[in-house]
A protein has these predicted regions:
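A cross-kingdom marker for long, charged
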Residues: 29-123, 127-362
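Sec/Tat signal peptide C-region and signal peptidase I cleavage site
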Residues: 24-28
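Bacterial N-terminal signal peptides
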Residues: 12-22
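Bacterial N-terminal signal peptides that target proteins for export
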Residues: 2-13
């Protein structure tokens, strides 16, 4: 999350320009000076169509789609169950090609409509998390590897599945490097955001004079649960060695890993509250209309959920967390590392949220 900055300043400055590499001391990769494409400033979280949710998302989607001709729309609109929907990735665009229409292909008005759609489709916290990921990508754009890997905040893509409708199911996907949101809407309401990936590299950085901490609050919320456990509970919660990556990321639809860790049934009420607070960091990315229902469902199955943890509270160190129950898988992985051109460019996170029973709203 961002630190010590008002929302107006945060979004106005987010990626108004990519940093000129000469404006910061070359620390991490000794990147040369690059010329960067200017971006339209990302607007504040604004809800021109009413409270965020299925109804507002429908209006915003139709307003966005109305700016395209039929030929162009065919490039980013697919059947509800199209195979393309499951072919998303968290890797840089220089490694994995994307489908959909990118931020870089949009006119100024279309970009405005895009951000209004995202605001109408996500909670304020969810919108902020998307902006933080894009800010990290702008930070990476100063790195010497940026051209090859296509680290560029214009390289995020939107696609639709099914035709946005008040009485038929449809969904949308927005993603790129370290981001893959998949929300499903039916009957005018958001039904699920499974699967959704939120990550960042770096996690702690300064962009255009604004300090960011992206995904760090998720890490700290998980560690707060672990720190509340007694010695026996911590031993039971031990996740073992930190894996190379999360187990249920892109390309792992339908895979349910074995249960590991401490059963929540053995936790105190205070510990359960901390666990629910950690879970909410992911669930509340989606609008309140579904997040509240989802948290109620999770609380009802709380004693069937397990919590596993390895690592500490340091942003720049190896950490792995898994929270898993009948309808829930959350994973967080921290590998650490320094990137970009600033000493504040620390940390590297991958996280995933899944409801194995409602993937893509099915």
């Amino acid at each position: 999350m961002t630190m010590n900055v008002q929302p107006q300043a945060l979004f106005a400055a987010l990626i108004a320009t990519f940093l000129a590499a000469a404006s910061l001391p070359a620390v991490a990769h000794q990147a040369p000076v690059h010329e960067h494409t200017q971006l339209v400033p990302i607007p504040d979280y604004d809800l021109p169509y009413g409270p965020a949710g299925g109804a507002a998302a429908l209006q915003a989607a139709n307003a966005f789609l109305a700016t395209f001709d039929e030929t162009t729309k065919a490039q980013f609109m697919f059947e509800l169950d199209a195979q393309e929907r499951s072919e998303w990735s968290n890797l840089p665009a220089g490694i994995v090609n994307r489908i959909g229409i990118s931020v870089g292909e949009l006119s100024d008005d279309q970009r405005k409509q895009l951000f209004e759609f995202l605001a109408s489709s996500l909670s304020e916290d969810g919108y902020r998390r998307v902006m933080d990921v894009m800010a990290a990508e702008a930070f990476l754009s100063t790195d010497s590897r940026a051209k090859r890997l296509k680290w560029n905040p214009e390289n995020y893509w939107l696609s639709f599945y099914g035709t946005p409708s008040a009485d038929a199911p449809w969904g949308w996907q927005f993603g790129g490097h370290h981001l893959g949101l998949n929300l499903s809407i039916d009957g005018g309401n958001v039904k699920t955001m499974s699967p959704s990936f939120v990550g960042t590299e770096p996690a702690v950085f300064t962009l255009d004079g604004i300090d960011y901490e992206a995904v760090v609050d998720m890490h700290h919320a998980g560690h707060a649960v672990f720190a509340s456990l007694n010695d026996d509970q911590q031993a039971a919660a031990d996740a073992g060695s930190v894996p190379e990556d999360i187990r249920t990321g892109p390309g792992k639809d339908g895979f349910v890993p074995p249960i590991i860790g401490l059963s929540t049934a053995g936790m105190t009420d205070e510990q359960k509250t901390l666990l629910l607070d950690a879970i909410a960091k992911w669930v509340t990315i989606q609008p309140d209309e579904n997040a509240a229902r989802r948290m109620t469902d999770i609380e009802a199955e709380l004693d069937q959920i397990s919590f596993a943890w390895t690592g500490g509270n340091d942003v720049n160190s190896p950490v792995y967390m898994r929270i898993q129950g009948p309808t829930l898988i959350i994973e967080l992985l921290s590998t650490g590392g320094n990137v970009g051109q600033s000493a504040s460019g620390l940390g590297h996170y991958h996280t995933i949220y899944r409801n194995p029973t409602r993937e893509y709203g099915r």
